[in-house]
Structures are given as C-alpha cells and as structure tokens.
Amino acid sequence: MNLCSSGATASASSTSLSSTGQAERNGGGKGGDGSGGGGGGGSSSNQNGSSEAINCFGGGPEPVSNLNSTINGGGGVGGAKTNSNTTANTTATSSNSTSNGQQGHTQHNENTATMPPETRPKVVTVKHPESNKPKPTTKKSKPIQADQDVIKALQRCRDEGIKRLDLSKSSITVIPNTVKECVHLTELYLYSNKIGQLPTEIGCLVNLRNLALNENSLTSLPDSLQHCNQLKVLDLRHNKLAEIPPVIYRLRSLTTLYLRFNRITTVADDLRQLVNLTMLSLRENKIRELGSAIGALVNLTTLDVSHNHLEHLPEDIGNCVNLSALDLQHNELLDIPDSIGNLKSLVRLGLRYNRLTSVPASLKNCKSMDEFNVEGNGITQLPDGMLASLNGLTIITLSRNQFTSYPTGGPAQFTNVYNINLEHNRIDKIPYGIFSRAKGLTKLNMKENMLTALPLDIGTWVNMVELNLATNALQKLPDDIMNLQNLEILILSNNMLKKIPNTIGNLRKLRILDLEENRIEVLPHEIGLLHELQRLILQTNQITMLPRSIGHLSQLTHLSVSENNLQFLPEEIGSLESLENLYINQNPGLEKLPFELALCQNLKYLNIDKCPLSTIPPEIQAGGPSLVLQWLKMHSPYRQM
C-alpha cells in the first residue's frame, strides 16, 4: 500500500479557516523568534525557526538571523534556554479563536446559538472557596479541539496547495496521517507543541525544505523522513532525543541542523555523510567525544558543541577550514589540537570554562579573530607573541586562570584592544609601558590579583573609562591619576589605601567611586569637584568626618559611609537633592543627625542601625527611617520650607 496516496477530497466549505488564519498563511504569518521558528513576510530566512546564533563568550545563544551580531555575548556563564515566548501567535487553524480563553462557553454556544432562549441548556458555574472567579462546570478540551483544528488545517492545505504551514504553539499532541496529502508543502512549523512522535506519512512531503520540530517531546524520527531529500533546515532543539536519529544521516541536502538541548551522548561516524552542512548545533547535550567524522564537514561555518562533556577534540577539526564560529565553552577540554591553526577564517572561538592549562601556538594563525576569551581555565601563560600576532583583537579576556604575569609580547599585543580582563589571577605587577600602544584602551579589569603598586606611567592611560583594581594590596594612588580625565568608573575596594590624593578632583567625568574596605581616615576637600558622581561608596574605612564640599555632589544618588568612625554629618548633606540611598549604620560615635537631612526630598532609604543617636527619642528610632526624617523635619528650623 502506498502511504502517500490521497484520500477523499473534503469540500472547501467544510474546511474553511478564519480570515485571520488565512491571511497569515497567504501572507507569510507573523514574525517568529529563533527558538520558535515562526517566520514572517514569506521570507524563508526568518521562517525556518532555526536562526540560532552561538555565543562563544557569554551566556546562552540569542536566536537572530545575523550570527555575527550576537555571537560574542559576554553575559552569563551558562547557556540559557532560547526564548520562544515572544513569537507572535501564527497558528494555521482557527483553534486560537475557540481554544484560547473560550473552552467552556464557545463550544456550547456553537451548537446553541440558533436555539430560542427558553430551550438553550444552562451553563452552571461554581465558585470555589479559594477563588472569587466563577468557573464553568464543563471540562476544558483544548488539546482535543486543537487536534481537530489540525485536521481542518491539513485539509485546507491539501485543497489550496499551500506551501507554508505554521501549526506552532497549538497544543497539538498528534499529527494526523492525512499530512501525507499536503505534498505541496515546502515549510512546516510544528514547534512548541506536545508531539511525542511523527507519523510515517511525514515522508510523503517530498518538497519539504524547512521543518521546525523544536520544543516538543520527540524521542525518535521515522525512517520515512529520508524521502524528504530536499530538506535543508531541520530544527530539533529542546526535545528528548537520546541519540541523533539515524535517518538524519541520510538527509544529504541538510545545510542547517539544530540539536541543542537534548540528551544525546554520542555522535555516529555517519555524520560524515552530511557534507552540505554549514551550521551544526549540538549545544547542551551529554556528548563526551566528537569523532573524526567532523572533519568531513568541510562546508561548516558554525559549529556549536558547548555545554557538553568533551575532553578532547579530534585533529580532524582542522579540516573544517571554512569555520568562522567555533563554540567549545563549558566542556571539560584538557587540550586543543595544533590543527586548530588551520582555521584561518575563524572569527569567534569560545573556550571559556574548560580545563585547559595551555593553548597551542598555532592559534596565532587565526588572524581573523576579534576576541580571545579563555576565562575559567587553568592557563599559566600564553605562547610567546601569540596575542601580538592576532592584531585584529579588540577584546582579551584571561580572567579566572593561573597567570602570574602579563602575557609576553610587549605593547604590540594590545594595539587595537579596547577591553582587557585579567580578573582573578595572581599577577603582582602591571609592566611599565605595556599599554603605550593601546590608544583605544577604555576598560581594564585587574580585580582580585596581587598588585601592590600601579605603574609610573598610569598617567598615559588617558582614554580609560572604566578601571577596576578591587581586591589587591594597593597602598597608594599616584598623583598622575589626575590625567585619566575620561574615567567614569573607578573601583578601588578591598585594598590598603590610607588616603586619596587631592588630584582625584580632576576626574570630572567620574560617576562611580568605590573605596570600600580600605584604611582611609580623611577624604580630600576636592571630592566636591566630582559634579557627575552618582555613587560614592566609603563603607568600612576609618573616616571620622565628611568634607563640607560633599554638598556640591548634586548628582549623587547613593552614599554609603557605614562602618566608619563618623562623629557627625555636615549640614551640607542637606544639599544632596538627588540622594536616594544613605547608609550611615555602624558608626559608634555618631550621636546626632543634622536637621538639614530632612531637606533631602528624594531620600528613599536611610540605614541608621547601631548608631547611638542620643538626640532622637528611642521610640522615633524604633519607628524606622521614615519616622526619623519626619521628626527631623518637625524639629528643624526648616520646617516651614
């Protein structure tokens, strides 16, 4: 028996859909996000539901059509599930009008709309104790209704020769075998349903180009799918596959294959048959080995095997000479093969959070890379001159490794770099002149190292915008810091600083100054010149008084002076018209607050815990900060203002 033979043709009137559904099918439907797969405007590039970009350097991938626009990420560590909830509803049936919010009443009304009022059956509602909302006694039947609507949609698809059918997000549990009659289909979107298996008849769709099955409950695929030999894009993300279904290896026309977020443990040698693949995503599975077959995929431009359990890569990876994006982050890699140097088209290489202790010198051949990120490994040094050879780099991230010194290669290695992150290493010195060619360097993170001093040429870092030197052993800031006049963020917390130079007042663009947990006793009067300052953190020092000039910080919203030795607050604090948060808790010598504090009309939070405020009645203090402010206002000479 021929599975693909057509059944009786239903009349058009019995299969008509809503006008909205028809418009969406004829016009291409509403645009979908990458996870869902719905497309828009008839454009196949955005309709295949498979435009997933890999994020080599940050969190999970963002589904966009332009891979290069989001690949470098930088956010979180883990790969987040692709968000498909923003996709507009584009179901190809009229089920949305009857199954979305109308289960109880709509089905009843369809059969009774023409009855006279006295003969219509009553719909009884019951109020449950836990809810004030009346609930119909009729049971919801959304899946049943959805499956019925699928049958209608398939009939219409057959009768009208529709080429693109979107049944996504329709609570479908079963695909009817009548799908075989939709032989004109080139695009079929079934993502975000409850499908556990596909019918054998799916193989009758011999013209199919795009098939989106992501976000279902599939554990296998029927062998008949091999007859869809024109299939180019197959999306199986977020299913329950324990292996790559063998039939996939026979789909020789595939160019894009998404298998992210399944339960796959092995990749068969038959993978070598998919020679037309340009994009392969195996992200977030349980794969421990990637065999030599990967080397046969010479047309690959994007390979994502991040968030697996790989310990090694085959040398054959060097045969994939067209690769521009290779994401290996969050595996258990112990080494990288020398053949990676053959990948001269490589722009993005994700190596974050593995178990590497070194990288091969051959990486210097990958001159197209614009970002180098090996965060979260155990690397102690880089091959001599490697960074200098990669002269297209703009971002270098070596954080959370075992570096004890800056990479060798001199100033040339940072010529075009604007962002350097060496956080959480064991570096005790920034070499003099190391940034002499880094004219574009705007962000340097040296947090959690072993620095005891800053280089004498710090005054040449004139384009620096953000400087993080927290958690080191710095004892002094050089006066030349005054030259960093583009600085907006300066983090110096957890050091051993005893004073701040007067030249700090030259940093007129500073928005954030963090001096928490040092040994500072006095702030310079020039602090009042920082008119753009929004956050000033002085917590856990030895400060006895704030300078009166602090009242000039008109943009200040956050001031923390807790855990110090304050004896009083200056009256000028009442001039901080933008102040929202004030922390003065745990100052054992602070016995009174200035009445002027009540003038801070935008103050939302005041922490005065463990301050012996003898001038304010205990019952007022017990009432909380808002009551304290009211008391100050009522007893101040400004109460009429």
Curated annotation (Swiss-Prot):
Residues 26-43 have a biased composition (Gly residues). One of its GO terms (cellular component) is cytoplasm. Pfam families: LRR_14 (PF23598), LRR_8 (PF13855). InterPro entries: Leu-rich_rpt, Leu-rich_rpt_typical-subtyp, LRR_dom_sf, LRR_domain-containing, LRR_R13L4/SHOC2-like. Residues 1-147 are annotated as: Disordered. SMART domains: LRR_BAC (SM00364), LRR_SD22 (SM00365), LRR_TYP (SM00369). Keywords: Leucine-rich repeat, Repeat. The keyword Repeat applies. LRR repeats lie at residues 161-182, 184-205, 207-228, 230-251, 253-274, 276-297, 299-320, 322-343, 345-367, 368-389, 392-413, 416-437, 440-461, 463-484, 486-507, 509-530, 532-553, 555-576, 578-600, 602-623. Residues 101-114 have a biased composition (Polar residues). Acts as a Ras effector and participates in MAPK pathway activation. Probably acts as a regulatory subunit of protein phosphatase that specifically dephosphorylates Raf kinase and stimulate Raf activity at specialized signaling complexes upon Ras activation. Belongs to the SHOC2 family. PANTHER family: PTHR48051, RAS SUPPRESSOR PROTEIN 1 (PTHR48051:SF1). This is Leucine-rich repeat protein soc-2 homolog. It comes from Drosophila willistoni (Fruit fly). The lineage of its organism: Eukaryota, Metazoa, Ecdysozoa, Arthropoda, Hexapoda.
